[in-house]
Structures are given as structure tokens and as C-alpha cells.
């Protein structure tokens, strides 16, 4: 009998165990599609990014012109640039939905997988931030200045740290050069860490909407979920093409069409939409160090979620109180996103402060209380 290469070849065997014969719960829903969509986003961003890097010049006097050159003179350069810029937005949409799924269905109980996922989120945010600086437009320059300046709030070493990051006494050529180097490097680190994320996931197997062990009812990943993933890819790529071809600048800031000018500050400095919720939390505290700590806490709080799980059930499927809180949290994050895009004036200041307070209140206090109440109501 001939050897089955798929199951015996050292490399093919690994691929087979992860993508073909992987035992998968039979009832996972569309919310489990976003992991593979993130993989597609990463591959697409690395591909388009590589093509852009071939024509981009990381120098303050040439960066803005080189991006214009890509859009005007390079074959399909406009398309590559639009796919890359809007691909970042889709990357964040997918990762936020992926995290939301993890929160709702208790996937965070796979602690290693969850913690690596949070590190991946932080790396993605860093990559997007340094990437936004590269076109060297007004918002690129001032965004870099404002956000890197936050490190100066760190006591004792802050100012030294900022000047070390800048490579001088302000955001200038050395800053742009190193940001380009980091923007090129980080996606490959993300790809490596994604494999670790998957390795830990495949140790325990996927969670499912009921939050119960599914060992008794597993089906092979291929063809059932491979075809479902391909449908997800098609839908996402259609939406991305729609955005990149018809309204490529919808999510961008018009200010970034002006070349960077250190002598003229834009009236409203704000990051891309996917950072606005964190930016609103940062702005809601009228103290530099306090704001920076709140900004860091807004993401790092996710590390505490598995420790605060007090329910006897894993998923929120049969927990109405927790469901109400979950959707309140989603609404809260949308409010923060909106407030982050508004100027710092009444009533946005107080709305931002209330939304920031309730963000931490729901995650750190109300979720555990609701879980304990639900246990009592069900006499668990």
C-alpha cells in the first residue's frame, strides 16, 4: 500500500493536522470565521506592503512625493496603496469582532491562546501606528509627535525615552527611517506569533457557542469549515474591493493630503478610526500620566478577563445578565469611538469621561457580579 504523503511527510503532516484533518466542533458559527480572515488580512497586508516598499523612499524630503509617485506612475500603484490602507481597517474590524467573540463565548478560558492574542493585538496596533507615519502627511507627523510624546509622562526616564525613540529632539528624518524599519519588521513577528497562537489553540481545540466540551461530536476541518472559510474570504474581499475602488479615502483624514509641516498644527489631531476608543479614554483624564496609564489599561485589562470569570458556565449563551452587560460594553465602545473623533469641548468631555468609567466598570466589576448572581439564580 502506497504511503499517504499528506499524513507522513514531516511538513505536510503539520499542515494536515492544522488545516485538513483537524477535529473541529460541529456547531461553531460564523463568529469563528474571523481567525482565518485575520490570516488572510495579514497575508494581504504583507504582500501589498512589500510591493509598496519597493517604490517608497523613507526620507522626510521624499516620502510624501514617493507615495504620490506610487499612486500616479506605478502600474496599479493606486490600487496597491488603497488596498493596503483600507486592508488595515479590515484587519482591525476582524480583530475586534474576533476579540468580541472570545469575550462572549468564554474562549478566554484557553489562557495561553488568549494572552498571545492580546500580545498580537498590541503588535498590530504598533504596526498600524508606525505605518500611519510613513506617508509623511500632516496627520502622520502630528500623530507621531503627539503619541510618542506620551512616553515623556513616564517618571524619571520619560524624556530620555522619547528622545531616544525620536533619534533627536523632535520627530524628524531618523524617526521616519526607524518607523519604516519597524513597520517592515513587525508583520513578520506577527506572523510568527500567529503560529504560536494556533499551536496553543490546537492543544485544547476550539471552543463552541454552547461553551461545553465537544470531544464527542467533532468533524474534520476540511471540507466543512474550509468551504465556510472560503465564503468568508470572498465576502470580505468583495467589501474591501468595494471600499478600495469606490471610496478609498472614506476612512482617512483629509489633513494627510498636505505634506508634513512642523510649523502648522492641524486644528484637530486624531488617530485613525480604529484607535479612537483608546484615544477617547486617554483624553478623558485631565492628567498626562493618568491618561497614559488609562490608555495602557484599556487594552491590558483584557489580560484580567480570565481571572475575573466567576460563572459556572463558560459561554454567555444562557446568561441573560451578562449578555445585557456585553452589549452595553459594545455600545460603550462605539460611544468612545465617536467621542474620540470630536473636539475636546462640552458635552464631549463629560460623555467621554462617563463612557471611559463605564468601560472599566463593566469589565472589572459588573461582569463578575453578574456571573455570581447568575450562579445563585440557577442554584449552581
From Swiss-Prot:
Location relative to the cell: Mitochondrion inner membrane
SUPFAM superfamilies: a domain/subunit of cytochrome bc1 complex (Ubiquinol-cytochrome c reductase), Transmembrane di-heme cytochromes
Organism this protein belongs to: Lanius ludovicianus
Cofactor(s) for this UniProt protein: heme b
Entry binding sites for a ubiquinone: 202
Keywords attached to this entry: Electron transport, Heme, Iron, Membrane, Metal-binding, Mitochondrion, Mitochondrion inner membrane, Respiratory chain, Transmembrane, Transmembrane helix, Transport, Ubiquinone
This protein's record includes keyword Transcription: no
Segments traversing the membrane: 34-54, 78-99, 114-134, 179-199, 227-247, 289-309, 321-341, 348-368
GO biological process: mitochondrial electron transport, ubiquinol to cytochrome c
High-level lineage: Eukaryota, Metazoa, Chordata, Craniata, Vertebrata
Note: Heme 1 (or BL or b562) is low-potential and absorbs at about 562 nm, and heme 2 (or BH or b566) is high-potential and absorbs at about 566 nm.
Family: Belongs to the cytochrome b family.
Membrane topology: Multi-pass membrane protein
Amino acids binding heme b b566: 98, 197
Protein's recorded name: Cytochrome b
Cofactor note: Binds 2 heme b groups non-covalently.
Pfam families xrefs: Cytochrom_B_C, Cytochrome_B
Subunit structure, interactors included: The cytochrome bc1 complex contains 11 subunits: 3 respiratory subunits (MT-CYB, CYC1 and UQCRFS1), 2 core proteins (UQCRC1 and UQCRC2) and 6 low-molecular weight proteins (UQCRH/QCR6, UQCRB/QCR7, UQCRQ/QCR8, UQCR10/QCR9, UQCR11/QCR10 and a cleavage product of UQCRFS1). This cytochrome bc1 complex then forms a dimer.
Amino acid at each position: 500500500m502506497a504511503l499517504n504523503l499528506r499524513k507522513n511527510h514531516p511538513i505536510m503532516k503539520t499542515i494536515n493536522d492544522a488545516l485538513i484533518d483537524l477535529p473541529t466542533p460541529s456547531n461553531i458559527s460564523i463568529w469563528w470565521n474571523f481567525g482565518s480572515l485575520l490570516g488572510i488580512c495579514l497575508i494581504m497586508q504583507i504582500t501589498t506592503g512589500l510591493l509598496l516598499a519597493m517604490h517608497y523612499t523613507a526620507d522626510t524630503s521624499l516620502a510624501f512625493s514617493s507615495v504620490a509617485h506610487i499612486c500616479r506612475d506605478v502600474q496599479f500603484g493606486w490600487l496597491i496603496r488603497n488596498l493596503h490602507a483600507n486592508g488595515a481597517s479590515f484587519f482591525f474590524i476582524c480583530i475586534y469582532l474576533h476579540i468580541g467573540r472570545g469575550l462572549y463565548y468564554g474562549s478566554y478560558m484557553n489562557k495561553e491562546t488568549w494572552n498571545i492574542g492580546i500580545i498580537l493585538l498590541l503588535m498590530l496596533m504598533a504596526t498600524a501606528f508606525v505605518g500611519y507615519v510613513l506617508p509623511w502627511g500632516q496627520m502622520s507627523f502630528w500623530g507621531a509627535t503627539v503619541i510618542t510624546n506620551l512616553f515623556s509622562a513616564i517618571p524619571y526616564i520619560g524624556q530620555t525615552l522619547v528622545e531616544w525613540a525620536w533619534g533627536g529632539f523632535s520627530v524628524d528624518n531618523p524617526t521616519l527611517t526607524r518607523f519604516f524599519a519597524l513597520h517592515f519588521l513587525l508583520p513578520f513577528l506577527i506572523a510568527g506569533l500567529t503560529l504560536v497562537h494556533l499551536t496553543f489553540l490546537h492543544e485544547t481545540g476550539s471552543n463552541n457557542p454552547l461553551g461545553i466540551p465537544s470531544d464527542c461530536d467533532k468533524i474534520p476541518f476540511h471540507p466543512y469549515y474550509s468551504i465556510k472559510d472560503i465564503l468568508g474570504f470572498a465576502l470580505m474581499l468583495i467589501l474591501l474591493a468595494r471600499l478600495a475602488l469606490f471610496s478609498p479615502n472614506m476612512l482617512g483624514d483629509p489633513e494627510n493630503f498636505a505634506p508634513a509641516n512642523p510649523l502648522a498644527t492641524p486644528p484637530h489631531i486624531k488617530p485613525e478610526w480604529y484607535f479612537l476608543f483608546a484615544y477617547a479614554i486617554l483624553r478623558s483624564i485631565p492628567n498626562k500620566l493618568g491618561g497614559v496609564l488609562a490608555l495602557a489599561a484599556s487594552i491590558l485589562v483584557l489580560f484580567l478577563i480570565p481571572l475575573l470569570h466567576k460563572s459556572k458556565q463558560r459561554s454567555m449563551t444562557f446568561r441573560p445578565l451578562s449578555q445585557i452587560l456585553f452589549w452595553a460594553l459594545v455600545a460603550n465602545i462605539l460611544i468612545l469611538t465617536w467621542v474620540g473623533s470630536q473636539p475636546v469641548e462640552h458635552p464631549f468631555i463629560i460623555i467621554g469621561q462617563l463612557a471611559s468609567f463605564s468601560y472599566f466598570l463593566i469589565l472589572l466589576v459588573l461582569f463578575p457580579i453578574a456571573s455570581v448572581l447568575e450562579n445563585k439564580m440557577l442554584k449552581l
